[in-house]
Structure formats: structure tokens, C-alpha cells
Regions:
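Juxtamembrane transmembrane-helix termini in multi-pass membrane transport proteins
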Residues: 3-73, 138-162, 169, 173
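Short, conserved phosphate/pyrophosphate- and ester-handling motifs at nucleotide-, phospho-/glycolipid
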Residues: 21, 129, 197
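Kinked, hydrophobic transmembrane alpha-helices enriched for aromatic residues
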Residues: 11, 127-141, 203-206
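Membrane helix-loop-helix hairpins that form the core translocation module of multi-pass transporters
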Residues: 37-118, 175
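Selective transmembrane alpha-helices of multi-pass membrane proteins
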Residues: 67-100, 165-176, 180-214
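Juxtamembrane helix-boundary/capping and inter-helix hinge elements in multi-pass membrane proteins
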Residues: 31-38, 113, 181-184
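Selected transmembrane alpha-helices and immediately adjacent juxtamembrane segments
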Residues: 115, 122, 126-131
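Short, strongly hydrophobic alpha-helical membrane anchors
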Residues: 1-4, 214
Length: 214
């Protein structure tokens, strides 16, 4: 693979990744609610989730989802409903949080209760995005040179995309977490939970409205 093609791929991916989708909205909402403690599990989940989506795309599931409206809809609804479930949990936590909660209560939110749950929730949101899986099937071949080893090129492109996605998620997580720390009062944290739940709800609706590429 030539450097020109690789740089073109990096540029195209960077433009697309900067635009927030369901995964990044999830990262922002959790970072706002949980601060710096969420950064590592969130970024790791994005990297592993994108790796999973890339793997299943290359193994043929992406082609199946592109060809079958039924299976695309099944995966789409699974991901969208899961996002709405997470949104409901975060909104409920925000509504139940008293305005005069102690700082310790705010610093250690109970929903989700652990870094593992932050990781698992974000991973599922990323991996269960059928539009992303189909996107990889349509997008990666545009940067493949027929005369060169196909598998090697796919590995390079996949590793590049996952790296860029992790960097992008890190940037969003750091900025969102910083906003949460700057406004660390109980009332502000309650608002962050409500805002985060709203973002997750928007991401869920976005996922449910996704259409199968023609």
C-alpha cells in the first residue's frame, strides 16, 4: 500500500470520525457523568467494538447485512433498544439524585456501578451498530490496490481505523470529562446525568432510524 493511499484513508476516516455518532454520544454522556475514571474503559471499549465490527465485516456478516433487510433490522433494533435502555437508566439516576447530595455521592455514581459496566455498555453500543458494519464493507475496498496482497492491506486499514477511532474517543472523553469536573456540584452532576441520558436517547433513536445502504 502506497503512502498516498494510506494518507487519503487517514484523511477520510478523520473527517467521518469527528462527526459524533451513537458511539461518541455514548462516550460523551458517560464521561460527563463519571469524569476521568471513565476514560480508559470507554476508549478500550470503542477500540474493541470497532475491531469486532471490522472483523465480522471481513468475515462476511457485513455483506449479509447489506443484502438482507431482515437481519439488518434485527441488529439495528438490538443496538437501538439497548441504547434507549441505557438512556432510561441514566435519566432515572439524574431524576432521583437530590439537589443537595453530598460530594461523595456525586463522585461515585451508582449507575453504572463499575468501570467494567462502562466498558461493556460502550462495547455493545459500538459492536451492535449494523450501519457501521455495512459501512466497513463498502468503505475499505475503496482503498485496496488489486495488485497488492489483499489481506495485508485490510489489516493495515483496519489497524489504522481502530487507532484513529481510539484517538477520537479519547479526545471526546477528555473534553467531556473536563466539563464534568469544572461543574462538580451536586446540582451540576444531576444535570450532567440528565444531559447524558438525553444524548444516549438521541443516539438510540438515531440507531433505530438508520437505513440499510442501497
Amino acid at each position: 500500500m502506497s503512502l498516498e493511499i494510506w494518507f487519503a484513508f487517514v484523511a477520510a476516516c478523520s473527517v467521518m470520525l469527528v462527526i459524533p455518532g451513537p458511539t461518541i454520544l455514548t462516550v460523551i454522556s458517560y464521561s460527563m457523568a463519571h469524569g476521568r475514571r471513565a476514560n480508559v474503559p470507554l476508549v478500550a471499549a470503542v477500540a474493541l467494538g470497532d475491531s469486532t465490527a471490522l472483523a465480522v465485516s471481513l468475515l462476511g456478516l457485513g455483506s449479509l447485512l447489506a443484502a438482507s433487510a431482515f437481519w439488518f433490522t434485527v441488529v439495528k433494533w438490538a443496538g437501538g433498544l439497548y441504547l434507549l435502555y441505557l438512556a432510561a437508566k441514566m435519566l432515572r439516576a439524574g431524576l432521583r439524585a437530590p439537589g443537595n447530595a453530598s460530594a461523595s455521592d456525586v463522585a461515585a455514581p451508582k449507575v453504572p456501578a463499575s468501570r467494567w459496566r462502562l466498558f461493556a455498555n460502550t462495547y455493545l453500543v459500538t459492536a451492535l451498530n449494523p450501519k457501521g458494519i455495512v459501512f466497513f464493507v463498502a468503505f475499505l475496498p475503496q482503498f485496496i490496490r488489486p495488485g497488492a496482497p489483499i489481506a495485508q492491506q485490510l489489516w493495515i486499514l483496519a489497524a489504522t481505523f481502530v487507532t484513529l477511532a481510539a484517538i477520537n474517543a479519547t479526545a471526546y472523553a477528555v473534553f467531556a470529562g473536563a466539563a464534568g469536573r469544572l461543574l462538580a456540584s451536586p446540582r451540576a452532576q444531576r444535570r450532567f446525568h440528565l444531559a447524558g441520558g438525553s444524548l444516549l436517547g438521541a443516539a438510540g433513536i438515531w440507531a433505530l432510524m438508520a437505513r440499510r445502504p442501497a
